[in-house]
Amino acid sequence: VDSDIDRLKNFELIPFSEAIKNQADAVMVAHILLNKIDPEYPASLSKIIITDILRKELNFDGVVITDDMTMAAITENYDIGDAAVRAVNAGSDIVLVCHGWANGTKVLDELTRAVKSGSISEKRLDESVYRILKLKYKYKLTDDTVNSVDIEKINEKINDVLNKFSLPAEEA
């Protein structure tokens, strides 16, 4: 995207700004490259975009999640583990990995290594943990185990409802 900061503020960022004013809980950051803002990194890896613009200028204090790190914009240009570390240091709270167990493992290993080595500071990690826990608390999300679901029972109930609203064969 070839927009400068003025164009972004007056056009592309308007929906984000409005969502933030209306207490959006989370924002997903895309892997788009904003050449005139940060010519080196896509938005999902850019401290300029996430911390300076989204958090400081737009005053967003909710959860920032990356787009899927297994997308070509990342995997064709970066090591997925290094990209995850960069995303967290840029200000993302959650790194999304949608495809491949090995990808998820690599990201987790690299993030763990980065925290242990100090590449990701404890302070930075605490900020993300706080925002995520605050969001979980707001929606009363817990880590309690959910009982297994009886699919047969659910299908029975669905069929009962559908049958109540179905026309008899001769009327159809």
Model-predicted segments: where are they?
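Short coil/turn connectors at secondary-structure junctions
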Residues: 22-25, 59-61, 90-93
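Alpha-helix-loop-beta-strand connector modules within alpha/beta enzyme cores
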Residues: 11, 43-65
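Active-site-proximal loop/turn and secondary-structure-junction residues that shape catalytic pockets
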Residues: 31-35, 70, 101
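Phosphate/pyrophosphate-binding betaalpha-module
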Residues: 4-26
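Preference for extracellular/luminal or secreted protein segments
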Residues: 56-57, 75-172
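Hydrophobic faces of well-ordered beta-strands that scaffold small-molecule active sites
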Residues: 27-29, 62-66, 95-96, 132
